[in-house]
Regions:
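Conserved hydrophobic beta-strand within the GNAT/NAT acetyltransferase core sheet
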Residues: 69, 102-107
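Acetyl-CoA-dependent GNAT
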Residues: 7-77, 88-90, 94, 98, ...
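Conserved acetyl-CoA-binding loop-helix of GNAT-fold acetyltransferases
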Residues: 80-93, 116-120
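Residue-level recognition of the GNAT/N-acetyltransferase active site
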Residues: 9, 75, 79, 106-110, ...
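Short glycine/proline-centered loop/turn elements that form peptide/ligand docking sites
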Residues: 88, 111-114, 131-136
Length: 147
């Protein structure tokens, strides 16, 4: 079955909030996702479906020609299948259409799988945010993909 990647809509919000809670210790709320859809000039989200099942999501917070990559979440049983790569490539393509040239993100320093994915997509580590994450406390790598 092929992965369908498309813009997040109202119909995706509950499944997105559930996926967020499954993947993160401090997840976005359903209301936060609702609020982001009301600000399409700032937030850009994409979701990935296999059949009727939401299996991944990712977003951008856009500011002029830069964007923060946020909320990259893939259901555990669907990781390492290229879904996140396809999702992020589509998200950055859509961001570029809106004038975004440079992308940044924070990732847990111990999340080696995600770091390898971001490096494969052209991101480079440019710094550390000490004790950035809570539950558990962990440093964040600051990564950039610059045009």
């Amino acid at each position: 079955m092929e992965t369908e990647i498309r813009p997040m809509s109202e119909n995706d919000l509950e499944a997105s909030a559930e996926l967020e809670a499954m993947c993160f210790s401090t997840p976005w709320s359903l209301q936060a996702f609702k609020d982001s859809l009301d600000k399409p000039d700032i937030y850009l989200f994409r979701v990935a479906y296999l059949g009727d099942e939401l299996v991944a999501q990712a977003g951008l917070i856009m500011s002029f020609d830069e964007a923060d990559v946020i909320n990259v979440a893939v259901k555990p049983e669907y990781r390492k299948q290229g879904i996140a790569s396809g999702l992020l490539n589509e998200l950055m393509r859509a961001g570029s259409e809106r004038g975004v040239n440079d992308y940044t993100l924070e990732v847990r320093a111990g999340n080696h799988g995600a770091i390898a994915l971001y490096e494969k997509l052209g991101f480079k580590s440019e710094g550390i945010r000490k004790d950035f994450y809570r539950e558990p406390v962990e440093d964040a790598l600051i990564m950039w993909k610059r045009s």
